């Protein structure tokens, strides 16, 4: 491991269409093999579908969905006296967003719809309505943290 200082966090530029850093991060997460244009068209197309389906602003629906996906607690493994405990800890704000986007895109890729644009749009709509696999993933994470609440005093 490097002995030098940790690399500074780089700011993400807001995307030109919605002027939102969150949308840029979603595009970066959807992007494969450096094809940003393709990723952007997928995300913007999904947002158009969301706008048609709901009649509301797609960015607001997306932000609601992200709030429903982002975890507040998670468990981390901690070794104490020869055994590993799953210790519940609060999730830092930056990691909350990262996990939410990661879960959203991963689960959208696993859906059965024909195009990625459809999958992403449907998963965002499901998450905004507090249903769908991404919200279930968050609930499972919270359930794990609640089940291991007895080990909370091992926090560091």
Swiss-Prot record:
Keywords: Ribonucleoprotein, Ribosomal protein, RNA-binding, rRNA-binding, tRNA-binding. InterPro entries: Ribosomal_uS7, Ribosomal_uS7_bac/org-type, Ribosomal_uS7_CS, Ribosomal_uS7_dom, Ribosomal_uS7_dom_sf. PROSITE patterns: RIBOSOMAL_S7. One of its GO terms (molecular function) is tRNA binding. One of its GO terms (cellular component) is small ribosomal subunit. CDD domains: uS7_Bacteria. One of its GO terms (biological process) is translation. Gene3D superfamilies: Ribosomal protein S7 domain. One of the primary rRNA binding proteins, it binds directly to 16S rRNA where it nucleates assembly of the head domain of the 30S subunit. Is located at the subunit interface close to the decoding center, probably blocks exit of the E-site tRNA. HAMAP family: Ribosomal_uS7_B. Belongs to the universal ribosomal protein uS7 family. Part of the 30S ribosomal subunit. Contacts proteins S9 and S11. PANTHER family: RIBOSOMAL PROTEIN S7 (PTHR11205). This is Small ribosomal subunit protein uS7. It comes from Streptococcus pneumoniae serotype 4 (strain ATCC BAA-334 / TIGR4).
């Amino acid at each position: 491991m490097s002995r030098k200082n940790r690399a500074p966090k780089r700011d993400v530029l807001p995307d030109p269409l919605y002027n939102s850093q969150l949308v840029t991060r979603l595009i970066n997460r959807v992007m494969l093999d450096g094809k940003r244009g393709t990723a952007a068209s997928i995300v913007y197309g999904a947002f158009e579908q969301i706008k048609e389906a709901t009649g509301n602003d797609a960015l607001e629906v997306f932000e609601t969905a992200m709030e429903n996906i982002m975890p507040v607690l998670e468990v981390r493994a901690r070794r104490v006296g020869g055994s590993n405990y799953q210790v519940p800890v609060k999730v830092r704000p930056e990691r909350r967003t990262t996990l939410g986007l990661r879960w959203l895109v991963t689960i959208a890729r696993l859906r059965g719809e024909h195009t990625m644009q459809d999958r992403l749009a449907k998963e965002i709509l499901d998450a905004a309505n507090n249903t769908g696999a991404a919200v279930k993933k968050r609930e499972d994470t919270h359930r794990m943290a609640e089940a291991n609440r007895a080990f909370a005093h091992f926090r560091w």
